[in-house]
Amino acid sequence: MRFFALFIYRPVATILIAAAITLCGILGFRLLPVAPLPQVDFPVIMVSASLPGASPETMASSVATPLERSLGRIAGVNEMTSSSSLGSTRIILEFNFDRDINGAARDVQAAINAAQSLLPGGMPSRPTYRKANPSDAPIMILTLTSESWSQGKLYDFASTQLAQTIAQIDGVGDVDVGGSSLPAVRVGLNPQALFNQGVSLDEVREAIDSANVRRPQGAIEDSVHRWQIQTNDELKTAAEYQPLIIHYNNGAAVRLGDVASVTDSVQDVRNAGMTNAKPAILLMIRKLPEANIIQTVDGIRAKLPELRAMIPAAIDLQIAQDRSPTIRASLQEVEETLAISVALVILVVFLFLRSGRATLIPAVAVPVSLIGTFAAMYLCGFSLNNLSLMALTIATGFVVDDAIVVLENIARHLEAGMKPLQAALQGTREVGFTVISMSLSLVAVFLPLLLMGGLPGRLLREFAVTLSVAIGISLVVSLTLTPMMCGWMLKSSKPRTQQRKRGVGRLLVALQQGYGTSLKWVLNHTRLVGVVFLGTVALNIWLYIAIPKTFFPEQDTGVLMGGIQADQSISFQAMRGKLQDFMKIIRDDPAVNNVTGFTGGSRVNSGMMFITLKPRGERKETAQQVIDRLRVKLAKEPGARLFLMAVQDIRVGGRQANASYQYTLLSDSLAALREWEPKIRKALSALPQLADVNSDQQDNGAEMNLIYDRDTMSRLGIDVQAANSLLNNAFGQRQISTIYQPMNQYKVVMEVDPRYTQDISALEKMFVINRDGKAIPLSYFAQWRPANAPLSVNHQGLSAASTIAFNLPTGTSLSQATEAINRTMTQLGVPPTVRGSFSGTAQVFQQTMNSQLILIVAAIATVYIVLGILYESYVHPLTILSTLPSAGVGALLALELFNAPFSLIALIGIMLLIGIVKKNAIMMVDFALEAQRSGGLTPEQAIFQACLLRFRPIMMTTLAALFGALPLVLSDGDGSELRQPLGITIVGGLVMSQLLTLYTTPVVYLFFDRLRLRFSRKNSKPVVEI
């Protein structure tokens, strides 16, 4: 009583406290970073190693395995995967959430150093690592085009200057440059000319390496001067290499230009990049796992004027893709939704109270509570994102509830003729415990979320804390500022009989009278209501089992990502043509704004594409509808497939799969994996619940298998090392020397000129110089025959792995897809040597599915404990919790009606309903208990009176929560696919709960009261006087 009086009778202090809360909130709002979702990225580090010319199997056994054994000992590694392809190995380390990325990076470097002695010689550089997830979509893509500069020169400028500058920007984790490779001097040998001159490929290699050296020469000095010695020991251009003498034949000099074409070219000619229809160099920028995407993009944009200033006029730098506009638009939509919710909630209050002064009170209380929450969000290190702003939108209905309960009770006393200050004090005292009970029990709902681990726990933590803080501030405001404003702003008045006969007042009176009549009938037919109550419990269970489920709603971010997978024996020239054909099909689609792509590198038969769609307001279709339309057109392209998926703000795992979801097969036997993977992939491709089924297992690449005759080799004076060196020199794009320049280092690359390697007959032209100096053709000691070979070898941990990726057809949920896959795996009878499990997002979905029911039960149990403590009763909390089944039925039916699967966002809605609908029961039970204690009423009379007396505030709070959630349902702008499931769940649950709990709660109250009396009689014993 004194606590409430302290604030009611000291209005200046109360107003200043509210002003301080508001000012702190405004400051916090200005300092809060902006993001699409809470920070939920796993710490990921990518280790790269290369050995030019080495086969995928050689890379896997000699490079990947030693590194994996060393890296696998690092603490906190959640998952380790690797992919080895021609001359390249990439290992992805995904760490636990609580692992510091910088500490993990130090451990990774130490593990690489430990494995260095086990790695093969000939590697051009030590393995390196980057703190970025290669499977994440770039946050920004820049393109460089030029009419006069070559692609190699553009690539050099991009990687040497632009990428270095961009990588220094805060938040940037990796800048991947694609579309070409660094400049190089390429030596294309003529095998027939070499044979005629009796020059081996090793001799050419050694001559070039010896002619291009960079060694310190020292200095000469006398008593007065010092001269630095400088020589022309380096050759830097193709023109300088051509006259190089590599051999003497009968005293005549054989120069490099006599046996080879020497050109200024690039290190790897099998690379191509395009933007729209133009050749381009792509700078794909990815952020650090812990970085904020908006701040990072803003930092890059702020740097662009400086970058453009350093670019020559012949180069055009453009932003091909930027993830931030759709994120900003989505957040703006949420902010507008929040403003609409506040306005609708205040309108509900006005319609019920029909007083401008009375409406002004919650109109002040709601913004103070919401704005004050921003200060706590800043102190907690949160961001303004879709989930935290959705929490505030939903909180609008909650925070006004507290003010409504206090305000309505004070207004009731004023209408009875009590003086304003006395009414404020008395009204607040009466409902103070009720408000505290409602708020604490609502906060209790979110305690299990705060303790939830893994990605879902990280994702929901900001939502739970933000909402809990808003409720806490609202509780303080409703017990301090609200009664003070009521006491000083409202006036005593007689019951507004005339006003109640008009408009909303007349409707409320009619509803209340009708409710009273129907409630009397219900209380006389309690068994029927009990059957209805039990029916809702059973219906909840059936609906939860039957409803389709998914992890997270499919987002329309306006960005698509596509992976090209061509025939495994395709040439680079043909693959480049496929890239151009696919880009043309996509560019012609009316919803597409921009398309960039590249192909080449270690996987000739693959490529990547990034598509930016037009803004949501400029296209009629969603991103998924655009994909469905393009899928039909792209399927007509022979010899290759393009798998498109919408970029999501949440992507789990480090695998660069060609679809959104993955199912991984593991085996200790590579042969067993290669036998069963095609069978499983074929069976899964036939499932209607899956689309775009593809696999990263590519073991049908064309290979030419050479079989050495070792006896003949020994007789001819040839060893295996010389033969292998011949093949590497001829066909491996071997980097044989380094050219040092002020800004970078470039390579001299040697191979047989591509003009002489157009078919297998090129092997017949190869020869080895034996120990006697004679040229021995390769065909003398080797036979060759075509075979199949893997284009890549993949590991997970230390086991051979193959990942089958898939998308979902429109109208199919992830739960339906996973059930179909599990059923198919059982039917196929896969042997124990091959193990299958979901990975990435599908794996997290499975884990979340297993914990959802536990989470809901934990929330209910927590609320029960809190209510039990507050009421000092085992029974009354059960009465209050009896409101939940009807809300659950309403929520699940609404999701079915809107064809929305049960997702993590819908789970949040269910958790919120646990907190919302019990408020009705709390108000009924509180007043019924008070009427029994102080009024001497029977339980039947008490609960009947409580229901009628609290009908108006129950309607007000329910409608306020409903109208607060309604804008989430009706939103259709950017990010609406995230907001709608939450709104649908809450609105559906509130409507059903309001229809049923007004009747079931009184019946349950009486049932437990009679049960309590029955047990108390049985346990009662006669008092014995001593």
From Swiss-Prot:
**What does the subunit comment say?**
Part of a tripartite efflux system composed of MdtA, MdtB and MdtC. MdtC forms a heteromultimer with MdtB.
Cellular component (GO) terms are:
plasma membrane
Q: Which UniProt keywords apply?
A: Cell inner membrane, Cell membrane, Membrane, Transmembrane, Transmembrane helix, Transport
Report which gene this protein is encoded by.
mdtC
Against InterPro entries, the record matches this protein to: AcrB_DN_DC_subdom, Acrflvin-R, Multidrug-R_MdtC
Name the Pfam families for this protein: ACR_tran
GO MF terms listed in the record are: xenobiotic transmembrane transporter activity
Entry's family note: Belongs to the resistance-nodulation-cell division (RND) (TC 2.A.6) family. MdtC subfamily.
Entry membrane topology: Multi-pass membrane protein
Protein's recorded name: Multidrug resistance protein MdtC
The answer, when asked if Cytoplasm is one of the entry's keywords, is no
Q: Where are the transmembrane segments?
A: 15-35, 333-353, 360-380, 387-407, 431-451, 463-483, 528-548, 853-873, 897-917, 953-973, 984-1004
Cysteine disulfide partners in this protein: none
State where the protein is found: Cell inner membrane
